């Protein structure tokens, strides 16, 4: 299943919302979105994984690549409530690398 992608501006932030599965078959959607981020002028990028049902190592690699591209110039926040995606991120130890908030309200609060 390809993840559905949504993109929105929220103030000085660009929010990329993913749904479904982020895996080898669908990771190109995330890569394309991150490439658009490079030219969008947003001060901060949020990747919303709230509706992601599954993420594999390819998806995790894409998130790490996104961090490398985005962080030197702007902030990056993962929005990821308790669930399958967060558990995979934690098992991989990436919760120590990324700023993770459980929802958009918490991300707004900082």
Regions found by a protein language model. Name each.
Residues 1-53, 64-110:
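STAS-like cytosolic regulatory interaction modules
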């Amino acid at each position: 299943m390809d993840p559905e992608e949504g993109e929105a501006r929220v103030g000085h932030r660009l929010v990329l919302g993913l749904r479904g599965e982020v895996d080898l078959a669908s990771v190109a959607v995330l890569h394309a979105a991150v490439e658009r981020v490079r030219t969008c002028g947003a001060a901060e990028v949020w990747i919303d994984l709230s509706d992601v049902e599954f993420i594999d190592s390819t998806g995790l690699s894409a998130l790490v690549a996104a961090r490398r591209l985005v962080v030197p110039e702007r902030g990056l926040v993962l929005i990821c409530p308790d669930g399958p995606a967060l558990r995979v991120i934690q098992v991989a130890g990436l919760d120590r690398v990324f700023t993770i908030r459980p929802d958009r309200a918490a991300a707004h609060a900082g």
